[in-house]
Regions:
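Non-transmembrane, aqueous-exposed alpha-helical and coiled segments at domain scale
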Residues: 307, 313, 319-351, 357-406, ...
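Polar low-complexity intrinsically disordered regions
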Residues: 1-3, 344, 452
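Polar/charged alpha-helical tracts
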Residues: 54, 58, 344, 442, ...
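Long, contiguous, compositionally biased segments that the model treats as domain-scale units
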Residues: 1-145
């Protein structure tokens, strides 16, 4: 007779977050479909497994110890319509291309993670949006409400969590097929990068591309097992913004009797929801997943230490990742005291730069792009600070796409504002396009090579 799996409903403490303040929370508890939606999510299969989550923790422990580099990228906010094979393969392909370049530059393995298969919600600075005298709830991502500016579309609908779950499942299925079925073959990915370097706009990166080419040919000449290089590990992560969703997908691991969030391998807490006494920190502190926290320019060393005490009291390498999003103008001044305080405490979080969120600008035309030069400058500042302090710059977290969008100004093959009318496609924040993403990877590889 099979012993039933332990239930998260019986595990102590998993619902204490409900008694705390909850920032950015949808107004849907009174919706007639709320209870049924939660009940269904409580019963669905996990999207990821505890063993995979544990493997990611061990990989991130390597990053914390300076033995690997962490790459995370994907959409600002995924859309249900964007979960097609072409769109998903484009994002995965771009991340794989970036990872090959970073692996060569760092001379270290790269932990690859998509900001995918669950990034369907977004925090907003205002609960409401007004257009032409009409005020409606803000768009909070397709797992909460619709983008169209109508009363019907903007209702917070809990049934959208179910669609988000099923869309995430199909996305993860495709990711696993791509990364385990030959799509990730090192030689194929490298050939794509040679095409990038052949563009005259990116001539400065041709030398490194050719060095990688020689390394691949050398491996082949030495009889390397390229069959083993046809597959790769690839993890999924998203911001754990919707606690109703995350709690409903919490499962108790039958091996350890410990709770895991099974909506993703990696979950992070945003800058707007990292209140130490808040619901987000409380729930995620109880899960065994590796956890990230976004740190903005207002973060103090004391803030970081209190977050460590709350989320990583055992000081386990690989448990906690600090994702700094301070802005190019702030990072060289604001980041050092935070790192020093953490170093002096003996904690070993992974340090990752998010060079996107602190660098959004507003143009008179109404568009909100990022400037590629600002993104690059924040990355450069991140590496400079770590070099000066003797600490390890563990990774980069970018909002990007595999498509030829025009949302971030500049780059070696520059995007101009005149392109926005036809190619500015994001429903939320601006993303690096395919070529800009690869250029960032080559630049980071240069910084890593210099550090070595």
């Amino acid at each position: 007779m099979t012993t039933p799996s332990p239930s998260a409903a019986d595990y102590p403490g998993l619902d204490e977050w409900r008694e705390r303040s909850i920032g950015q929370h949808p107004q849907w508890a009174e919706h007639p479909d709320f209870a049924d939606s939660i009940q269904e999510l409580n019963a669905v299969p996990p999207l990821v497994f505890a063993g995979e989550v544990d493997r990611l923790r061990s990989r991130l422990a390597q990053v914390a110890n300076g033995e690997a580099f962490f790459l995370q990228g994907g959409d600002c906010a995924e859309t249900f319509a964007g979960a097609t094979a072409d769109k998903i393969s484009g994002r995965v392909r771009t991340l794989l291309q970036m990872a090959v370049v970073l692996t060569y530059g760092a001379s270290l393995p790269v932990v690859k993670m998509g900001r995918m298969a669950g990034q369907f919600s977004k925090p907003r600075s205002s609960n409401e949006e007004t257009r032409d005298g009409v005020t409606l709830p803000s768009f909070r991502g397709e797992m909460v409400n619709g983008f169209d500016f109508t009363e019907e579309s903007r209702v917070h609908d809990p049934k959208r969590m179910l669609r988000g779950y099923h869309t995430s499942a199909s996305t993860l299925n495709l990711i696993r097929a791509f990364t385990q079925g030959g799509f990730a073959d090192l030689r194929r990915v490298h050939a794509w990068n040679m095409g990038f370097a052949a563009n005259p706009a990116y001539a400065r990166y041709e030398t490194m591309a050719r060095e990688i080419d020689h390394a691949v040919k050398f491996m082949a000449a030495c009889g390397s097992d390229f069959d083993a290089l046809k597959t790769t590990e690839f993890f999924a992560g998203h911001e754990a913004l919707l606690l109703d969703y995350e709690r409903a997908l919490t499962r108790i691991d039958s091996r350890t009797n410990l709770p895991y969030g099974t909506s993703a391998h990696f979950l992070w807490i945003g800058e707007r929801t990292r209140d130490l006494d808040g619901a987000h920190v409380d729930l995620l502190s109880r899960l065994r997943n590796p956890i990230g926290v976004k740190l903005g320019p207002g973060t103090s060393g004391e803030d970081a230490l209190r977050l460590i005490d709350a989320l990583d009291p055992e000081r386990e390498p690989g448990r906690l990742t600090f994702i700094t999003r301070m802005g190019a103008k702030n990072i060289r001044e604001k980041l050092p005291p935070v790192i020093r305080a953490v170093e002096e405490s003996g904690a070993k979080p992974v340090w990752v730069t998010d060079p996107m969120h602190g660098n959004t600008v507003s143009l008179p035309s109404g568009y909100k792009p990022r400037r590629f030069e600002d993104v690059v400058d924040e990355v450069r500042g991140f590496f400079e600070v770590h070099r000066e302090l003797g600490t390890f710059p563990g990774g980069i977290h970018v909002e990007m796409t595999g498509d030829d969008v025009a949302e971030c100004l500049g780059g070696s093959d520059p995007v101009a504002e005149s392109s926005f009318a036809e190619r500015y496609e994001t429903l939320c924040d601006p993303r690096l396009n395919h070529m800009q993403s690869l250029e960032i990877a080559f630049l980071v590889a240069e910084y890593l090579s210099e550090q070595n």
